[in-house]
């Protein structure tokens, strides 16, 4: 079939298997060109391994450290002749290239929040890997069923007051104002349950209790802090409460891993285009302006550059970039005053007429489509391709 992008709001409902493979290969090439990460992990579990920062972490571990990896994700396999999700194609491509390199690369497709998937993951580690020395937690989800069977929903809302935000209607390319009503306490609590640190702690406790964490094992969960422009909807909003919960839970995790001489850290990464960030009303405009400024200043980075740098400089670096709260920081270039001041100045100038001139909206759109395997150099999008791609190392629940 010939596959073209079909975008509905902040989701592309099609994905291109050849394009996704090429995108994964580009990220692998970046890592191999930038060299081995000294002292890196050798047996790695990545939770949320199929897209964005989680995929970049799996690639960095495998191709930067020579690590065997087990990935957990929740993706859609297309029925015969139908399209699979981008994350499915990404994971198939990752496995293909990792196995070619002689690395262990297996995957579990299912709800990482569930006890069933935790049990299956532990069984697989015991059988195939023995013990693991890094756990990357990179889950983003709209809802979570907790161990008691209660379904919690996450919400993107401000706290305390309604907020009117500038943004881009990405379908029409026009600047719009969106007013978001404040979250109720129930919505805040639900968001913390889904996107906070509770499930991360459940994972680490389960792995530790099963004795599958190696001495010196590390774990990290990803977060975003941002600056003034994004803080009403992000850090000071319902999602920010969840991210603050990560900061609380990591202290317990760090204490619990001390007996293994291990460590737990929250890692702060810069704003990038992901399926999660594209759903946040303010982010397409913010990212379009940020890309413009950081590209002009020569500091623009995507997921793979961020995560490879995090591994090399901080997770396994001799002088990790830590802030006063003990977080690892890979986002400092975004927060430079000269970057934020330039973005803020453009923010106040942007209109329908000049949005394509003073922002990199074209770059944002291209990055968004790349998530789904489109706009990748060297891919023939007029070619007939087979949408059915198997993941040979898939472990069924």
UniProtKB/Swiss-Prot annotation:
Q: Does the keyword Ribonucleoprotein apply?
A: no
The answer on whether this UniProt entry bears the keyword Cell membrane reads no
Matching PANTHER family: ENOYL-[ACYL-CARRIER-PROTEIN] REDUCTASE [NADH]
**Annotated protein name in UniProt:** Enoyl-[acyl-carrier-protein] reductase [NADH]
Q: Which Pfam families match?
A: Eno-Rase_FAD_bd, Eno-Rase_NADH_b, Enoyl_reductase
Catalyzed reactions per annotation: a 2,3-saturated acyl-[ACP] + NAD(+) = a (2E)-enoyl-[ACP] + NADH + H(+)
| Gene3D superfamilies xrefs | NAD(P)-binding Rossmann-like Domain
Enzymatic class: oxidoreductase
TM segments?
none
Q: Give the pathway annotation.
A: Lipid metabolism; fatty acid biosynthesis
State any single GO MF term: enoyl-[acyl-carrier-protein] reductase (NADH) activity
Q: Which positions are annotated as binding NAD(+)?
A: 48-53, 74-75, 111-112, 139-140, 243, 272-274
Summary of subunit composition and partner proteins? Monomer.
* Catalytic residue list: 234
List site positions: Plays an important role in discriminating NADH against NADPH.
Answer: 75
* Gene Ontology terms: biological process: fatty acid biosynthetic process
Q: Where does substrate bind?
A: 224
Q: Where is the signal peptide?
A: none
Q: Which UniProt keywords apply?
A: Fatty acid biosynthesis, Fatty acid metabolism, Lipid biosynthesis, Lipid metabolism, NAD, Oxidoreductase
Question: What's the family?
Answer: Belongs to the TER reductase family.
Its biological purpose is as follows: Involved in the final reduction of the elongation cycle of fatty acid synthesis (FAS II). Catalyzes the reduction of a carbon-carbon double bond in an enoyl moiety that is covalently linked to an acyl carrier protein (ACP).
């Amino acid at each position: 079939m010939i596959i073209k992008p079909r975008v509905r709001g902040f989701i592309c409902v099609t994905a291109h298997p050849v394009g996704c493979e090429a995108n994964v290969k580009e990220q692998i090439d970046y890592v191999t060109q930038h060299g081995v990460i000294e002292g890196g992990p050798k047996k790695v579990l990545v939770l949320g391994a199929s897209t964005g920062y989680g995929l970049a972490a799996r690639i960095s571990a495998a191709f930067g450290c020579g690590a065997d990896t087990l990935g957990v994700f929740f993706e859609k396999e297309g029925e015969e002749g139908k399209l699979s999700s981008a994350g499915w194609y990404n994971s198939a491509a990752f496995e293909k290239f990792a196995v070619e390199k002689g690395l262990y690369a297996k995957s579990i497709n299912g709800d990482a929040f569930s006890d069933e998937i935790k049990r299956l993951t532990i069984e697989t580690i015991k059988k195939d890997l023995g013990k693991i020395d890094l756990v990357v937690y990179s889950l983003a989800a709209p809802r979570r069923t907790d161990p008691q069977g209660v379904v919690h929903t996450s919400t993107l809302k401000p706290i305390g007051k309604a907020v009117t935000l500038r943004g881009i209607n990405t379908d029409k390319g026009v600047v719009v104002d969106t007013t978001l009503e404040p979250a109720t306490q129930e919505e805040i609590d639900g968001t913390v349950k889904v996107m906070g640190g509770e499930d991360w702690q459940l994972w680490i406790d389960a792995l530790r209790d099963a004795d599958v964490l190696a001495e010196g094992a590390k774990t990290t969960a990803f977060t975003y802090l941002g600056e003034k422009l994004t803080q009403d909807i992000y850090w000071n909003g319902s999602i920010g409460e969840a991210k603050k919960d990560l900061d609380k839970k990591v202290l317990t995790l760090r204490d619990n891993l001390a007996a293994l001489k291990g460590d737990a850290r929250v890692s702060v990464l810069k704003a990038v285009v992901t399926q999660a960030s594209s759903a946040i009303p303010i982010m397409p405009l913010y990212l379009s302006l940020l890309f413009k400024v950081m590209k002009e200043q020569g500091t623009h980075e995507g997921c793979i550059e961020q995560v490879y740098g995090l591994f090399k400089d901080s997770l396994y670096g001799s002088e990790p970039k830590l802030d006063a709260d003990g977080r690892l920081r890979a986002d400092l270039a975004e927060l430079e005053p000269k970057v934020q001041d330039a973005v803020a100045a453009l923010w106040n100038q942007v209109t329908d007429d000049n949005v394509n001139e003073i922002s990199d909206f074209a770059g944002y759109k291209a990055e968004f489509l790349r998530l789904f395997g489109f706009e990748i150099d060297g891919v023939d999008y007029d070619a007939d391709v087979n949408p059915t791609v198997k993941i040979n190392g898939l472990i069924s629940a």
